[in-house]
Amino acid sequence: MDSTLDETNELEKISEDDVGTVPEDAFVILDGTRVVPLNQVVVNIGRRIENTIVVDDPRVSRTHAQLRAINGRYIIFDLNSTGGTFVNGKKVDQSILYSGDVISLAGADFIYGQKNPPPRPDLKETLPL
């Protein structure tokens, strides 16, 4: 697995105090209707019943991906899944998640959300017309 993030989602340096800081009011939307609050430092996603989020889809690996709370943000890690992990249509090994990101695990889609999210560093502020 590649140990670096893509250049648009680089991690900032992390202190030990920041590891495990769960983002406030984070959630994922499954199947377009089911809202699952995220309130754990580590969230495992896959077909196995032991996962935090169980996805009943044969395309999804038993232990497909993992969300980790680091520096007040969730970062998704692909766990060497067969079908891959995608964020906004781009295949990733790991990626910082931002509110509104679409996560696809081998075709099973989720939407990551967060109330009052921090700003995205890759989006420039625009002035009103």
Describe the residue ranges of each PLM region:
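Short polybasic amphipathic segments
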Residues: D25-L30, G83-T85
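Short small/polar-residue motifs
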Residues: N9-D17, D31-R34, S61-A65
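Regulatory inter-domain linker segments that are low-complexity and enriched
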Residues: M1-A26, A108-L129
